[in-house]
Amino acid sequence: MSTSNYINSFAPAKINLGLRIFGKRKDGYHELQTLMAPISIGDRIEITLLSSGIEFESTGDFDVPKDSSNLALKAALLFLSHHGLKTGLRIKLTKIVPPGAGLGGGSSDAAAVLFSLNRMLAIDETMENLIRLAAQLGSDVPFFLLRKPALCTGRGEILHPTSSFPYPRKGLLIYPGFPVSTPWAYKTYDELCKKGLILPSPSQESDKPVNDLEEAVFSKYLWLPAVKKWIQSHFNPEVCLMSGSGSSVFALFSKEDPRFFNDLIQQAQAYLGPGCWIRLFEILEQF
């Protein structure tokens, strides 16, 4: 819903259908290849234009920073500064996506703010320029501007939209109730590679999608491989992976029968207990 001074946007989470790492770059980032897809679970961003001042409010299922370290607010400040605008804003974030879960919630919020302000303020910035601006906020932010599945390379900011998606659309998503730090995950991966405890990507060819960060994250958070093994042994998914740098684990199924998914989520809730955030979702081909 939008008017000239108000817009209400959906900011979907994403999953990574594989994440391959091809070494560390001179700028400190890692060279990546990952297929990312938006899903039907997401936050909501409401923006109202004001005569002056910047107001930010966050409600919902999870607490997030309410200062300029929040990516949604940071995106708004960057957009206004980039275009030399003094417009006042009220931003209301309804937080549904757990932070620190490898689901890109903060990045999606930032992209939704950039996309919305570009429309509301009639800037008509090109997608290329918006993506360039988004890359200043984080490696995953450009992907959410594309609004469809994409193969992402570089540090994740180089986008290759995909028209063919070879995986099932329906799945189960589990957040264990604790976050994983992305810098820690990559640092641990590098350390384990140096010790020869993890083989680099070229040595790990696979017919199915692989997340190269799993071994690093699983080495500390033993609950995650246990959950992945439980899903694989009980429900035989087509794909079961940790998303991004964790901590969420997801599974995709080719089943269509609603009874299967009802049984799936009931068994997951019974096995994992009330401390886990468990949801069914669908992959979005466009949003």
Swiss-Prot record:
Catalysis performed (reactions): 4-CDP-2-C-methyl-D-erythritol + ATP = 4-CDP-2-C-methyl-D-erythritol 2-phosphate + ADP + H(+)
UniProt pathway annotation: Isoprenoid biosynthesis; isopentenyl diphosphate biosynthesis via DXP pathway; isopentenyl diphosphate from 1-deoxy-D-xylulose 5-phosphate: step 3/6
Segments traversing the membrane: none
Disulfide-linked positions: none
GO molecular function per UniProt: 4-(cytidine 5'-diphospho)-2-C-methyl-D-erythritol kinase activity; ATP binding
Entry keyword annotation includes Kinase: yes
Positions with a binding annotation for ATP: 98-108
Top-level taxon of origin: Bacteria
Alphabetical list of InterPro entries matching this protein: GHMP_kinase_C_sf, GHMP_kinase_N_dom, IspE, Ribosomal_Su5_D2-typ_SF, Ribsml_uS5_D2-typ_fold_subgr
SUPFAM superfamilies linked to this entry: GHMP Kinase, C-terminal domain, Ribosomal protein S5 domain 2-like
Alphabetical keyword list: ATP-binding, Isoprene biosynthesis, Kinase, Nucleotide-binding, Transferase
Enzyme Commission code: 2.7.1.148
Residues at the active site: 14, 140
GO biological process terms held by the UniProt record: isopentenyl diphosphate biosynthetic process, methylerythritol 4-phosphate pathway; terpenoid biosynthetic process
Family the entry assigns: Belongs to the GHMP kinase family. IspE subfamily.
Chain's role: Catalyzes the phosphorylation of the position 2 hydroxy group of 4-diphosphocytidyl-2C-methyl-D-erythritol.
NCBIfam families (alphabetical): ispE
The protein, known as: 4-diphosphocytidyl-2-C-methyl-D-erythritol kinase
Record lineage: Bacteria, Pseudomonadati, Verrucomicrobiota, Methylacidiphilae, Methylacidiphilales
Gene: ispE
